[in-house]
From Swiss-Prot:
Family according to the record: Belongs to the prokaryotic AdoMetDC family. Type 2 subfamily.
Active site: S112, H117, C140
Protein name from the UniProt record: S-adenosylmethionine decarboxylase proenzyme
Originating gene: speD
Keyword Protein transport: no
Organism: Enterobacter sp. (strain 638)
Signal peptide: none
Length: 264
């Protein structure tokens, strides 16, 4: 697509949202509590702020405000308001203060923003634990959130990823012609590095006429050691390893396809 000469500001809104999952198997209630405490500390509000601040640098956005909060018993959220143009440092709020409660998040959606919420959880009986990071990067103007895609997936050590990208609104050129998208895209995968594509099985569901793009990703390589917490696979019997592997694969496929799979 040729470079457009716009009439005024680029009014398109580009939103990239995705869920990133980390899966783990634990043998005891103590291991479960230990995993949740570990993952909650690993992705606390301070670390997430560092990741999102670097994301702003990658996409060329200027930080206006940062709100962050660690929650009890677990979970964290960070919201960063950003602008495309440089801003007067005197107008920036550099202080730290609690992030929004879930019902208050909509108050941030009228600006360009980057936000993340984390959700550690566990199965009541089967020993399965999942950590989900829910991330949204929404920008107005020429800034593209797709530039941060590889960085965010790598930083959050993802087993499964579901990604949605949408362009909303329209902008006009100097002749008054409306444009509902200002760049070429037929798949989110086009914005991923080759090494990233090699790590995951991927599936697209796109609605081109609505400028809606969806990609699902499932890690190809399965190493049981990667999914155990404080237990080594070699300390388990062959039958135990098979049972745990089957449980993990079923859990991962259910998350990937977004539906429960009946036991065979």
């Amino acid at each position: 697509m040729k470079k457009l000469k716009l009439h005024g500001f680029n009014n398109l809104t580009k939103s990239l949202s995705f869920c990133i999952y980390d899966i783990c198997y634990v043998k005891t209630a103590e291991e479960r509590d230990g995993y949740i405490a570990y993952i909650d500390e690993l992705y606390n509000a301070n670390r997430l702020t560092e990741i999102l601040s670097e994301t702003c640098s990658i996409i060329g956005a200027n930080i206006l405000n940062i709100a962050r909060q660690d929650y009890e018993p677990q979970g964290a959220s960070v919201t960063i308001l950003v602008s495309e143009e440089p801003v007067d440092p005197q107008l920036i709020d550099p202080t730290e203060h609690p992030g929004p409660l879930p019902e208050a998040v909509v108050a941030h959606l009228d600006k360009s923003h980057i936000c993340v919420h984390t959700y550690p959880e566990s199965h009541p009986e089967a020993g399965l634990c999942t950590f989900r990071a829910d991330i949204e990067v929404s920008t107005c103007g020429v800034i593209s959130p797709l530039n941060a895609l590889n960085y965010l997936i790598h930083q959050l050590e993802s087993d499964i990823v579901t990604i949605d990208y949408r362009v909303r609104g329209f902008t006009r050129d100097i002749n008054g012609m409306k444009y509902f998208i200002d760049h070429e895209i037929n798949s989110i995968q086009n914005f991923m590095s080759e090494d990233m594509k090699g790590l995951y099985d991927m599936m697209d569901v796109n609605v081109y006429q609505e400028n809606i793009f969806h990609t699902k990703m499932l890690l190809k390589e399965f190493d049981l050691k990667h999914y155990m917490f404080h237990t080594q696979p070699e300390d388990l019997s062959e039958e135990e390893r098979k049972v745990i592997t089957d449980l993990l694969w079923k859990e991962m496929r259910e998350i990937y396809y977004g539906r429960n799979i009946p036991a065979v």
